[in-house]
């Protein structure tokens, strides 16, 4: 697996996180955090089985921690699908 795609929900999560970061920490810090997600997306795509399985919550789903957020994804054929990016919320309620 070497490529990934983001669901609309994951794209909305990224926008929400960035807007929050700008308001709370300023544009420079928010941008650094935002771009760090894409580094993690690449890591996930290159080694998708290296990260924690959360099949106990939803079958086939995995989680990669990025800062204070968790990237929720699944492997679908020859690509990784980024499902959502969540913070400290209850993961069970979001999936």
Task: Give the location of each predicted region.
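Basic, Lys/Arg-enriched alpha-helical interface segments
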Residues: 1-57, 61
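Enriched for short, Lys/Arg-rich terminal
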Residues: 66-95
